[in-house]
Amino acid sequence: MLDIKAVLFDCDGLMFETELISQQIWKDEARKLGFTLPEDFFINITGSGGEELNRYLSSIPNGMDLYKVMKKKRFDISFWSSIQKDCLNKKGLITLFYWLKQHGYRIGICSSSYRTYVEALLSTVSTPLEYDAIVGGDMVTHAKPDPEIFLVGAKILDVQPAECLVLEDSKQGIIAARRAGMHSCFIEDTIQPDHTMKEMIEYQTENLEEVIQLLR
């Protein structure tokens, strides 16, 4: 049994089924600009942000032009807020949040996306999720794989890093959790673990509901 006091959630692809929709938007917009995305594009950008994301996109021809378009389309609050209730929920989302609250765990949502975007996704859940903190990418200086976002989350929740379990679906997030000195659980969405990830993944489950078994 893990000695955990707080659970830190990533958002896109972990709590909500947004990655496939987002990936299609990236592909469509790249096509409009006249190029095809590299094969490793999504494993490099998923969960990333800030300088790390800018550095990668700058290495791709037309990458920054694409990013300017995507900043408007990908994070269109009105689009995500208008989606049918519970349509984006990942399996076990409501069950896990309810169980964690019933058992006294502190809950943080730590996403590379802006807080307003995270709140828009949360508004699509029919049963309001109870949580203790949201840390958005616009609230930190360094994006994942830097551990800052998770360390800020732990500080807000008043727990030690070693008392946190991070739930992630991205390479950048898993690396950030390790660097933060936290436990991590990988739940696969669109990214299959590469060699680096496999070395860093501590636990892995098929869905959010199975996380309960780790904590019992």
What are these regions (language model features)?
Residues 2-99, 103, 128:
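N-terminal helical cap/lid subdomain that shapes the substrate entry/recognition surface
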Residues 1-5, 98-101, 114-216:
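Asp-based, Mg2+/Mn2+-dependent phosphohydrolase catalytic module
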Residues 32, 43-44, 83, 108, ...:
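Short, flexible active-site loop motifs that bind/organize anionic cofactors or intermediates
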Residues 58, 79-80, 105, 136-139, ...:
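A broad detector of the eukaryotic-type serine/threonine protein kinase catalytic domain
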Residues 14-15, 84-85, 107, 138-139, ...:
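A generic structural signal for short
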